[in-house]
Amino acid sequence: GSPIQCAETCFIGKCYTEELGCTCTAFLCMKN
């Protein structure tokens, strides 16, 4: 399936929830 969008957008290519498995993809933070 598709990645789940996290609760934030990216800020300068970084996600605040990266430690929870979220990564920056096309200005959105997605859980992979």
From Swiss-Prot:
There is a cross-link at residues 1-32 (Cyclopeptide (Gly-Asn)). This is Cyclotide Hyfl-B. InterPro entries: Cyclotide (IPR005535), Cyclotide_moebius_CS (IPR012324), Cyclotide_sf (IPR036146). Disulfide bonds join 6-22, 10-24, 15-29. Keywords: Disulfide bond, Knottin, Plant defense. Probably participates in a plant defense mechanism. This is a cyclic peptide. Belongs to the cyclotide family. Moebius subfamily. It holds the Pfam family Cyclotide. It comes from the Eukaryota. The presence of a 'disulfide through disulfide knot' structurally defines this protein as a knottin. SUPFAM superfamilies: Cyclotides (SSF57038). GO terms for biological process: defense response.
